[in-house]
């Protein structure tokens, strides 16, 4: 009998990103693909290096949180040795702002999401929901995560991501110029990317603000494929 692979879901941080609800969307998929699951509410599990060495995939949704040095050391060591790391939105790209080594490993950090016209804002999260297009890159057209998916539109937060050239960018999105914003030319950021780190694979989807976003057929397919791609 083939041995099951192990997946660890680490969720927590800001409740506005619905870490429990969004990760729960993918539990049946992981189980159907033969993963034995463990769920951790927070980062303490990362300090258990013996356990992490047995994990094939970490799914992290933990926004605007912090991580202790021994916890990050455990996470980093696991990825370097081949454990896959995957996540979406601020749960992976805005997790531990004070840890430069984490940002280096992930390859992207949320910096901004543009808002609606100030005269139309109501003080709700939807003030930051814009209609925009996710453009599949040339690399993305042939990558197993995004192959066969055309450019698609979303209405949700549009992440401006600070990143580097080491990422394999599978899709992008462009922040347009509007009269009330500070920038004066369009800015293109990665929306979907992967990154090899040691023997491990990292997958990041910037879209994924709330359940309704990960339920979008294109986003769901990309995340599901990304989880399988990242796993050892």
What do the predicted segments below correspond to?
Residues 4, 8-9, 14-95:
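Helical hinge/lid and interdomain linker segments adjacent to catalytic or ligand-binding clefts
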Residues 30-31, 38, 54, 122-198:
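Catalytic beta-strand/loop cores that center a nucleophilic Ser/Cys/Thr
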Residues 102-109, 151-168, 218-232:
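Oxidoreductase and adenylate-handling cofactor-binding alpha/beta cores
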Residues 2-6, 32, 178-191, 196-232:
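Extracellular ligand-binding/catalytic regions of CAZymes and related secreted enzymes
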Residues 66-144:
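A glycine-rich, often tryptophan-bearing local segment used as a flexible ligand/cofactor-contacting loop or short
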Residues 14-15, 65, 92-94, 151, ...:
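Short, solvent-exposed loop/turn segments at secondary-structure junctions
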Residues 27, 76, 103, 146, ...:
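Non-transmembrane alpha-helical segments in soluble domains
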């Amino acid at each position: 009998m083939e041995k099951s692979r192990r997946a660890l879901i680490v969720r927590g941080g800001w409740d506005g990103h619905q870490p429990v609800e969004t990760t729960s969307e993918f539990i049946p998929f992981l189980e159907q693909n033969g993963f034995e699951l463990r769920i951790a509410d927070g980062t303490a599990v990362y300090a258990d290096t013996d356990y992490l060495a047995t994990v094939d995939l970490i799914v992290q949704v933990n926004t605007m949180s912090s991580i202790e040095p021994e916890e990050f050391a455990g996470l980093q060591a696991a990825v370097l040795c081949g454990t896959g790391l995957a996540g979406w939105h601020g749960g992976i790209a805005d997790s531990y702002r004070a840890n430069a080594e984490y940002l280096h490993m992930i390859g992207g950090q949320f910096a901004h999401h543009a808002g609606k016209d100030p005269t139309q804002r109501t003080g709700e999260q939807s003030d930051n929901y814009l209609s925009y297009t996710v453009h599949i890159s040339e690399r993305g057209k042939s990558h197993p995560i995004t192959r066969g998916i055309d450019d698609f539109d979303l209405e949700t937060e549009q992440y401006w991501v600070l990143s580097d050239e080491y990422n394999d960018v599978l899709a992008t999105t462009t922040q347009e110029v509007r009269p009330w914003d500070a920038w004066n030319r369009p800015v293109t950021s990665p929306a979907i990317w992967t990154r090899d780190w040691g023997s491990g694979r990292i997958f990041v989807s910037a879209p994924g603000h709330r359940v309704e976003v990960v339920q979008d057929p294109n986003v769901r397919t990309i995340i599901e494929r990304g989880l399988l791609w990242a796993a050892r």
